[in-house]
């Protein structure tokens, strides 16, 4: 029933991991690793492939979501009779929601593999996409497709649901991740039926459900009876654009926000791959620009007893993490960190836009043999429409007027 074909193609690696076979390959595939000092130089093709995939930076949303999911999974492991508490990751487009979901799924998959043993036949994690205009039966078919559950044309929705619930419980699925949840519209009859069907599955499948979608609280998903039930059972994590600066309080000298002097990203294991988290060695390695690769860049103010306010720069920290992971031969360390205000203007603090900008700039630098990322090179790259609408360089009117006024001839 569950396919176990080890042969992976490039097309498979590029596809969304919405079947168990594809998700297992995604989770087991080692994440990209930044070059280490003393390593032999990589070839052009190797470096192009590396920057295409690139490291994943552990943003605050990734760290918080992982902790929440692990807590909910422990809370609901032995719960019976009622639906387990769930979680919704929401935010604007290109803020790393899907990457956050996949990184959490990868981490939970690897943790369960260690706990149960590599030879175990369990399927701990399921990842599904809500199809556009989803009906209840379409959702049921997506659940069946993930595990390769046989479905015939004559089967009713109730029969498919019964087969799905039995298989998911018997094979040990503990975490169900549903992406693009904003596509459900309970205000329509089909959308309401799909929302009710999803609620029914949360009560029949012994797993923790985590959803991700665009600005979910502003959609119809939280309205009506079904929406109220979902909102009453699901916690919310906002995956917002990264601010240029933020303040957090501290009560003890030498302590960070985690309370023990470590960056919050040090509390979790390795991760990698994608546009949202700095996994692997890049999360703890200290860069040559003076900031650690997980972005431990903060300024403290307050009294002599250690209490006060810590000024943190989450966006600058993320830029530092990505810059420290570059594999370019002539790039000047710290140059992108100094451009952090400009990069924040270009991307509006959206992690997806930032990742695409730096990955494209790195690949261009390899192809044109400049081997470095500069401000002019970044200016030459057109980003997604959202980012370009946000960033409109303003030329001072006086300078523009001078440029358009012909020079006077001397007599």
Regions found by a protein language model. Give the residues of each.
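Mid-core helix/loop region of P-loop NTP-binding domains shared across ATPases and GTPases
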Residues: 27-43, 135-142, 151-208, 250-251, ...
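Phosphate-binding P-loop
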Residues: 76-84
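Conserved lysine of the Walker
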Residues: 97
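Hydrophobic positions on the alpha1 helix immediately C-terminal to the Walker A/P-loop
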Residues: 100, 104
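A short helix-turn-beta junction within AAA+ P-loop NTPase domains corresponding to the substrate/partner-engaging
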Residues: 224-244, 296, 303
């Amino acid at each position: 029933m569950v396919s176990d074909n080890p042969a992976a193609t490039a097309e498979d690696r590029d596809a969304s991991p919405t079947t168990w076979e594809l998700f297992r390959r995604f989770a087991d595939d080692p994440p990209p690793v930044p070059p280490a000092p003393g390593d032999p130089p990589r070839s052009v093709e190797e470096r192009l492939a590396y920057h295409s995939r690139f490291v994943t930076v552990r943003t605050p949303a990734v760290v918080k979501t992982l902790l929440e999911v692990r807590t909910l999974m422990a809370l609901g492991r032995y719960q019976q009779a009622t639906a387990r508490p769930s979680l919704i990751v929401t935010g604007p487009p290109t803020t790393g929601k899907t990457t956050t979901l996949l990184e959490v799924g990868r981490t939970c998959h690897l943790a369960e593999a260690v706990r149960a043993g590599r030879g175990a036949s369990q399927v701990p994690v399921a990842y599904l996409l809500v199809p556009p205009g989803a009906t209840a039966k379409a959702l049921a078919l997506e659940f069946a497709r993930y595990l390769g559950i046989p479905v015939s044309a004559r089967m009713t929705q109730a029969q498919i649901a019964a087969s799905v619930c039995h298989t998911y419980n018997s094979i040990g699925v503990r975490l169900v991740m549903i992406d693009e949840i904003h596509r459900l519209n309970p205000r329509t009859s089909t959308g309401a039926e799909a929302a009710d069907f999803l609620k029914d599955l949360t009560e029949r499948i012994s797993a923790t459900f985590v959803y991700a979608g665009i600005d979910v609280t502003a959609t119809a998903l939280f309205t009506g009876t079904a929406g109220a039930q979902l909102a009453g059972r699901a916690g919310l994590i906002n995956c917002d654009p990264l601010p240029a600066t933020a303040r957090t309080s501290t009560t003890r000298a030498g302590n960070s926000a985690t309370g023990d002097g470590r960056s919050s990203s040090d509390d979790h294991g390795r991760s990698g791959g994608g546009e949202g988290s700095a996994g692997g060695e890049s999360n703890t390695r200290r860069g040559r620009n003076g900031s650690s690769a997980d972005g431990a860049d903060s300024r403290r103010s307050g009294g002599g007893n250690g209490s006060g306010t810590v000024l943190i720069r989450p966006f600058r920290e993320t830029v530092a993490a990505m810059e420290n992971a570059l594999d370019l031969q002539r790039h000047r360390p710290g140059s992108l960190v100094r451009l952090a205000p400009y990069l924040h203007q270009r991307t509006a603090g959206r992690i997806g836009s930032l990742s695409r900008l730096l990955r494209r700039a790195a690949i261009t630098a390899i192809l044109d043999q400049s081997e470095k990322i500069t401000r002019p090179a970044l200016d030459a790259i057109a980003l997604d429409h959202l980012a370009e609408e946000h960033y409109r360089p303003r030329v001072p009117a006086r300078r523009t007027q001078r440029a358009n006024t012909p020079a006077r001839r001397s007599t």
